[in-house]
Amino acid sequence: MKPKNVPREIFNPFTNKTSLGTRREGLFLCKRLKLRPDNYLEEYCADLEVIDIMAPIRPADETERCPPTSTSDDQEAGDYLVSRNKKSRNSDYMLFSSDALVHIAHDAKVSEKYTWLGERLRLTFKMMRSDSRLIRTMCHSHGFMQCSSKNPSVNVIWMGAPVKSVRMRELMPWQRLNQFPRSTELTKKDRLYENIERSKSIFGESFDFIPEFYVTPRENRKMENAFVRVAKEIAAAGGELCFPGEFIVKPTNSRQGKGIFFANSMADIPAEGPLLVSRYLKDPYLVNNHKFDLRIYVAVTSFYPLVAYVYSEGLARLASRPYDTSASSADSNEYVHLTNYSINKNSTSFVRNESMSSEDLGHKWTLGALLRYVENEGKDAKLLMLRIEDLIVKSLLSIQNSVATASRTNLRFACTNFELFGFDVLVDQALKPWLLEVNLSPSLACDAPLDSLLKTRLIADLLNLACVPLLDRKIIDSVTPALRKSMNSQESESSETDDLELDPMCAKTLKRRPVGLKRSVLNKKIVSGSTSLIPNNEKKFDQIVRKAELEDGRRGDFIRVFPRNGTWGMYSPVMEDLGNEDFDERLFDEVVTKKNTKNSSGSSKASSSSASASSSSSSMHIEDLSDLFHEVMMQCDKYSSIADVPIEIREIISPWYEEASEYTKKITQEGETYACKLPVIRSTARLRTKSCAEFYEVRKVQLAKKKESEAMASKENEPIVLQAVVAKRI
C-alpha cells in the first residue's frame, strides 16, 4: 500500500498545469472542484493516483458569457443549465433539458445557453446501428461532439441493436451505454414469454399476464394438440372459431408489426421458424369502438439490485378501423385487429394528430388522454396503471437472474449502463392488462407534434437518470491508459479461475428449481459459484446506492416503481435468490426505509399514519399480505376499483395510487408554446470528428444516388400513354 502523503504529480484544471503535491493537497483541490461524496468516480481514480477528476462547472472568477440587458431573452441567457426538475444538482453530472432544443436552431437568440459546457469539456457521443435524429439533436444541443463508431473513448454510446456482452467489459467508469448484457431475454418475444412462464411455474398465478403461447418448431406437437383442444371446446359450446383466428403468429425477432398473421389450424403455420404462436385476445377494451394498445416507456438503471422507473407520459395507439370479428372484415384484417402505428399509418382511414393541444385526436393518443377517457367511462384508471406497473416489475424480475449473472461477469464498473424499454400492453374488457411484447430501443421517431414533445422530454429525463459525468477530455486521456493497464492485469489474474467463477450451472440452477424447493436449500447449491469476476462487490453496491439516491432528484417525469414504499414486502416472495449479498433488500433499506425514518422523525402526522397502517396489517403475515396483493393485481373482475381492495392492501398501495395520478395529467399547459417538430441544427453546433463527418458525406452521396436510381426506375415503368401526355403538356 502506498503512503498517503508521498509527493506526486497532481493536475490542476484551474491553471491547466501539473505540479508535485501530496494526497492531502489533492483532496484540498477536490474541495475547490466541489467534488461531492456521492461522486463514486473518485474511488476508481484514487487508486490510479488521480484525485481531481471532476471538472468544475464554472470557476468562481469566470465572467458572464452574456452581458446583462433589459430583455427577457438576454436575462435568460445567464442560466446555463436549466432543468424541469428543480431538485437536480448540476455540479458533477450533465443536466439535460428539452428546452435546449429551442436554442440549437439557426434563429436561436441565446445560442450557447446549453452548448458551452459540453464544448468546453469536449464531451463526445457515438451512435452504433442507430441513426436516431432525436438522440443526435439532444446531444448536439448540449455541446456533445459526435464521433465515429470506432472511437472507444466517448462519453455516451447509443446502440440501436443488441451489444455483445464481452464488449461491455471495455466500458470505462465515466462512459454510459444504453444497454445491459442479456437484455434480449426481455426483448425477444420467445425468450420473454418463456421467462415469464418459468416464473409462473415457480411462483404461481402471480405471473398470469401473458396469453397461452407456443414456439415453433420445437413445440409443434404441443401446438397441434392445442389447436385440436380449442376446436373441441368451441364446438362443445356451440360456437364458431374466432375470426380472423384463434391464434396470432409473430416472428420472434421482428418489430413494427412485420410478419404478423392469424391461424386457426396447424395448416396455417409455416414450417420455417422460429415463430411465437399465442392465443388471440378477442375481448379487448374498446375506445370509440376501436381496439388499442399502450406504449409504456420503462427505464432501468440497475438490474442487481433492481432500480426501475416508468415514464408518466406514454402513447395509446388505436387501430384505424372499427373493431369487428366477423368475416366481413377480411379485406382489412390488419387495420382492425393490429394496432401497430407502422401498419395503420398506411390505412386510408388513418387520421394523424397534427394538433399540439388535442391529445385525443386521431388514431394516436397520449396515455393521459386515454386514461381520462377510461375515467369518464366510470372505470378506475389509476388502479389500471398500478396493475401495469406490477406487470412491468414482474417482467423485469423474471430476467433479473440472467442479466445479473452477465453483469457480474462483463460490467467491471458500477453505473455505466442504463436502458430504455418500450412495453406494449393490451387491456381487456375487465381492465386487465396483458403484456404483448417488450421493445429494445423503442422508436424515437417524431412523426407528430405530440410525439416530438413527449419523446424529447423522455430522452432528456432518461439521460439525466444515466448521470453522465462532467469530465474534461484531458483528464480522460491521462487516466485511460493507466486504467486500461489495470483492467488488463486484472483480466490475466482472473483467467486462471474463470472455470470456477463462470460455471454455467450456477446461472441455470434457479431456472431448474422445482416448485416447492426451499430457497435455503437452493442457496447451499450455489454458494460456491456466486463469486464475481469484479472483486469489490461491496464498493460497487455502495456506488449504486449513492447513484439511486442521486437519481431521485434527477428523474424528472419518471416514477420509480422499484424500489419504493412497500415493494420489498410485496415482491420479495416472488423474487429469485441471486446470491447471499441480498443487494435488493439492502438497497430497499438504504433508499426507502432510512428515508422514511428520517422523514417521519420530524412529522408526527407521518408517524401516526405509519403506526395505523402497521397495526391494521400486523394481524397478517407478510407472505399472506403478498399473496393477497398479487391476487388483487391479477383478479381484475373481483377487484375492479380501489374501493374493492382489502383495507390491508389498500394501506400499502395508497401512496402508489396517489402517485398514479401523474399518468392522467395533460402533457401540455394552456398558454405555453411548444415546438411542433425537431429543430434543424445550426452548422456551428453540429459538431463531428473528421472521420464522422466523412462518413455522413459518403452516406449523403449514396442516398442521393439511390434516390436518383429509384426515380429513373419508376419513370421507366410509367405507361407509354402517360409519358406521351406528360410530354405533350411540356
Curated annotation (Swiss-Prot):
Keyword Nucleotidyltransferase attributed: no
SUPFAM superfamilies: Glutathione synthetase ATP-binding domain-like
Record EC number: 6.-.-.-
GO CC list: ciliary basal body
Tissue spec. comment: Expressed in body wall muscles. Not expressed in sensory neurons.
Entry keywords, A to Z: ATP-binding, Ligase, Nucleotide-binding
Residues at which ATP binds: S278, R279, Y280, L281, K291, D293
GO molecular function, one term: tubulin-glutamic acid ligase activity
Pfam families named in the record: TTL (PF03133)
InterPro entries, per the entry: TTL/TTLL_fam
Protein origin, superkingdom: Eukaryota
Occurrences of domain TTL (ranges): 120-478
Biased composition (Low complexity): 600-618
Catalytic activity: L-glutamyl-[protein] + L-glutamate + ATP = gamma-L-glutamyl-L-glutamyl-[protein] + ADP + phosphate + H(+)
Region feature (Disordered): 594-618
One GO term of the biological process aspect: microtubule cytoskeleton organization
Record bears the keyword Isomerase: no
Protein family (similarity comment): Belongs to the tubulin--tyrosine ligase family.
Function in brief: Polyglutamylase which preferentially modifies alpha-tubulin. Involved in the side-chain initiation step of the polyglutamylation reaction rather than in the elongation step. Together with ttll-4 and ttll-11, required for male mating. Probably by regulating microtubule stability via the glutamylation of tubulin, negatively regulates axon regrowth after injury in PLM neurons.
Name of the protein in its database record: Tubulin polyglutamylase ttll-5
Organism: Caenorhabditis elegans
Biological classification of the source: Eukaryota, Metazoa, Ecdysozoa, Nematoda, Chromadorea
